[in-house]
Each structure stands twice: as structure tokens, then as C-alpha cells.
Amino acid sequence: MLAILGFLMMLVFMALIMTKRLSVLTALVLTPIVFALIAGFGFTEVGDMMISGIQQVAPTAVMIMFAILYFGIMIDTGLFDPMVGKILSMVKGDPLKIVVGTAVLTMLVALDGDGSTTYMITTSAMLPLYLLLGIRPIILAGIAGVGMGIMNTIPWGGATPRAASALGVDPAELTGPMIPVIASGMLCMVAVAYVLGKAERKRLGVIELKQPANANEPAAAVEDEWKRPKLWWFNLLLTLSLIGCLVSGKVSLTVLFVIAFCIALIVNYPNLEHQRQRIAAHSSNVLAIGSMIFAAGVFTGILTGTKMVDEMAISLVSMIPEQMGGLIPAIVALTSGIFTFLMPNDAYFYGVLPILSETAVAYGVDKVEIARASIIGQPIHMLSPLVPSTHLLVGLVGVSIDDHQKFALKWAVLAVIVMTAIALLIGAISISV
């Protein structure tokens, strides 16, 4: 019963947001509440589940909210204007070079393994160029989202350590054969960027730029009075120090962004009224994304608290016919994206994956192959509304999450298919009939 309700809840949720009957925020909150009540849970129990889910995402929500404020202030001060001008002089107004450069930059920055950091750095560097040249921002969001999903499979990314720990396999044994698979995903992303960039070049042409972006151009989107050219070096050092601490992982991301934002605000805008105006300028974005993350916490809290996710996993495994047992690695590779789109990574890797692994072992499949297969679907996972950094990305770029999903999903599926094919070809995962 719980499994059926869980699947129905997912279908209703996706239908509501794809048809735009409800906003993502209201669908995230109301859909699980209704289905939990139908399942027989009381208001008090559902309330406790909601609070539990909110508590789990609270640190992430605070981090992202202050990260948006920090990078918003940095854009206001003009920190990124020289970099935008330099990049413009290199790409010479060619949309193709900019879009391909977006893919390369995303995957380079994503080597730190953190989606929020990757999105903030990539959008800060590239969005002004997209706005200045008229390139569709949805392309930036799509490339960054799918590219981050591919890089989430690196050994220190979000998926690989979970898969290794959930199944008790040696991380080195898991990741070694996956290196060519990850490389194929990266090449696929560059190829996709080339196709999209070529289409934008055909639409816009190569634009002649007579001067670099400045405060009066769309790239800056900020009035001269908020620029702080005399504090440029200070802001650069502060940002580099922040990024260095982020990469080191020695200090909480939430703590780092709260402190960095306060320092940046006080130094650049010591006047209290100016501080209020700058915070107000970015408050709508902060509120929209923060509320979305807390709503996602409500969804996952109820999904986990009602045990729907556990029952869904068991029912799906039981549906695999005995004669298809040897195909389980390929099935896991192709379905892991669907699973992790509909539920958080933790729920999949620690709830669903062990069941899939035990089933595969019964058919003579090595569990390390299941671990490898389970991380291939990450490009699709990173488009999920349950991933907090996804809301950060669409908020920074200025697109809706449903438009982002509609645009990027086909490219994410393509990346998963390519990576699965390469994994089968080189023997990282195997099938038998």
C-alpha cells in the first residue's frame, strides 16, 4: 500500500509541476502531506516528519541564502567586470566559444565536488557574457546542471563515496574502471555544448564588441553608485580566500558564507542605509530559493518518515524477472537517474541500493559493479527539485526550475546513455543473459 501511494505521489507531484498547475514550492509541501494523510498518518506524525526534514536541510538552506547574498554583493561592487572583459576579448563575441567554455569551466570548477560552489563560480563568470551577447540563459543552466551531474561521479564527489560506503566496497576498486566512463561523459558534455553553441552562433552571429562590459551594459546590471573599484583587490582576496576555505573543507560552508558576507557588506557599504538597500536588492532571490529548499525538506522528511521510500525500493526490486537477473547492472545504470531524481541521494544509496545489490549478488553479479552502475545516473539526479543546489543554479541564472528540467533532461539522458554504453564496452559493468 505504501509503495503504491509513494509512486502515485511521485506521479502527481511531477504532473503538477510539469503542467504548472502548482508551483514547485507548493507542490513540494502539499503533495506529500495529502498522501501521508491518505496513508493513515495523523497530523501530529506528519508535522514531526516535516520538522525532521526541515532540520536536515536547514544548514544547506542558510549556506545557499548567504552565498547568494555574498556573490550578489561581489557583482554589485564590480569584482567580475575585468574578468568578463578579458573573456570577451578572448572569445571575441562568439557564442559558440562562450557556450563550450561554459562546459569546460563547469567541469573544471566541479573538481572540488561541490555543486553550490560550482554553480556560483560558473554563473558569476559566464552569465554576464550570456546577457551581453543575448545567448539564452537556459543554456547556461542546462550545461552547468548536467556537467555538475557528470562530475558528481568523481571519487570525491557526492555519489561515489555514498555508493562505496553503502555497499562496503573498496573506493579504489569502484572508481578505477570508472575513469574512462567519467571522461566519456565529459566529452559528451563538450559535444552537447558545441551543438548548442553552434545553434546560438547561427541565431545571433558573431557579435562585434567595441568595448568590454561595464556598468552600463547588461553584463553588469548594476548602477555606477554601487561599484567599488578602489576595493577591487580587497574583494578579490576575500573571494579567493573564501574559495580556498571552501575547497579545503576544514570549515563549514554555512559559517564561511555568513562571515564572508558580513565582512563584504561592512567593508564595501559601511553606510547602514546602503547595506539595507543592497540586501533588499537581493532579498527576493534569497527568499525564493530558501523557501524552495525548506519545501524540499518537507517533501523528503515525509517521504522518509512514512517509509514510502523503503517500500518503493522493495517493490521495484521484486518486479525484476528472474531471467533478467544478469541485466541488473545495466538496469541499475539506466534507472539510477530516475531513482535519484525522485528521492534524495541518501535515500537511494542507503535505502534502495543495498536491496538492488543483494538481488544482483543472488544472480552472481559482483556488488562492485552495482556500485559503479549506481553513480552513472547523476546527470539526471542534478536536475531534481530535491537537490538544494539546483534551486541555487536556477535562481542565479534567472530561469524557472521546470523550464530548466524540460531543456536539460534530454541532454542528461544522453549523457547517461553514453556513460552506460562506455561502461559496458570497457567492462566496468557487465551483463549476462
From Swiss-Prot:
GO terms for biological process: citrate metabolic process; transmembrane transport. It is a multi-pass membrane protein. It is found in: Cell membrane. The chain crosses the membrane at residues 2-22, 24-44, 60-80, 98-118, 131-151, 176-196, 247-267, 286-306, 324-344, 345-365, 379-399, 411-431. Keywords: Cell membrane, Citrate utilization, Membrane, Symport, Transmembrane, Transmembrane helix, Transport. One of its GO terms (cellular component) is plasma membrane. Induction: Expression is under strict control of the medium composition. Induced by citrate, via the two-component regulatory system CitT/CitS. Repressed by rapidly metabolized carbon sources like glucose, glycerol and inositol, via the carbon catabolite repression system. Is also repressed by succinate and glutamate, albeit to a lesser extent. The uptake activity increases with increasing Mg(2+) concentrations. Inhibited by FCCP, TCC and nigericin. It holds the Pfam family CitMHS. The keyword Membrane applies. One of its GO terms (molecular function) is citrate transmembrane transporter activity. It comes from the Bacteria. Proton motive force-driven secondary transporter that mediates the transport of citrate complexed to Mg(2+). Cotransports at least two protons per Mg(2+)-citrate complex. Can also transport citrate in complex with Ni(2+), Mn(2+), Co(2+), and Zn(2+). Belongs to the CitM (TC 2.A.11) transporter family. This is Mg(2+)/citrate complex secondary transporter. It comes from Bacillus subtilis (strain 168). The gene is citM.
